[in-house]
Design a protein with these regions (language model features):
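An N-cap/entry alpha-helix motif that binds or orients negatively charged groups
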Residues: 1-22
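Short, solvent-exposed polar/charged micro-motifs at secondary-structure junctions
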Residues: 3-4, 31-35, 115-116
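Canonical Radical SAM [4Fe-4S] cluster-binding loop centered on the CxxxCxxC motif
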Residues: 17-58
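Solvent-exposed, flexible loop/coil residues
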Residues: 25, 31-33, 141-145, 173
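Core AdoMet radical
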Residues: 44-61, 65-87, 94-154, 160-170
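Short, intrinsically disordered, charge-balanced linker/junction segments flanking boundaries
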Residues: 175-178
């Protein structure tokens, strides 16, 4: 049964996506974060983390190297901050203007207006993990936030027209098999 499933999955993959292997290049442009998620090294309460934020020239330089290596998608990632929507839009626009690649954002939950601004600037995809479907575990992992808020953010991203990447953390303490 496994071999038949694998063969069928390969047929569907070839029909839907073709033979090209998409290569994504991740640029972590900042490790600043306003949240204090219990599992994350970027959490705001981590006193040993030296914070940084790349400027636009550094991001473009990293993107240039990534594209030269054959990257199809640039993933711009940071912790969650809400003080720079215009800056992110400007960087997305600069990358889309300069390079023939897709731009994916991974910058946490944001206001709907920011999602729209970045979409207009040229971002086409957004990564926003929900980590668990258990509301009480989500609240324990993300102090001050709820699973309903995360689901709402995912729905707002969908309405804004993004392709969305999401998912779980497998093996997080407190997780149950169901």
């Amino acid at each position: 049964p496994y071999e038949a499933l694998r063969e069928r999955a390969d047929e569907v993959r070839a029909r839907e996506k073709g033979e090209h292997v998409f290569v994504r290049g991740l640029i972590e442009f900042s490790n600043r974060c306003e949240r204090n998620c219990r599992y994350c090294g970027l959490r705001s309460a981590n006193p040993s983390l030296k914070r940084y934020r790349l400027d636009e020239a550094q991001i473009v330089e990293a993107a240039e190297r990534a594209v030269a290596f054959g990257v199809d998608t640039l993933v711009l990632q940071s912790g969650e901050v809400h003080d720079e929507p215009q800056r992110i839009a400007h960087v997305v626009d600069a990358l889309r203007t300069r390079f023939p690649v897709a731009v994916t954002l991974s910058v946490g939950e944001q206001p709907t207006a920011s999602y729209a601004l970045w979409k207009e600037a040229g971002a086409s995809r957004f990564l926003l993990k929900h980590e668990t479907a258990d509301a009480s575990l989500y609240a324990a992992l993300h102090p001050g936030y709820t699973l309903a808020q995360r689901v709402d953010a995912l729905q707002r991203l969908r309405r804004a027209g993004y392709e969305i990447g999401s998912g779980f953390i497998v093996g997080v303490p407190g997780q149950r098999p169901e």
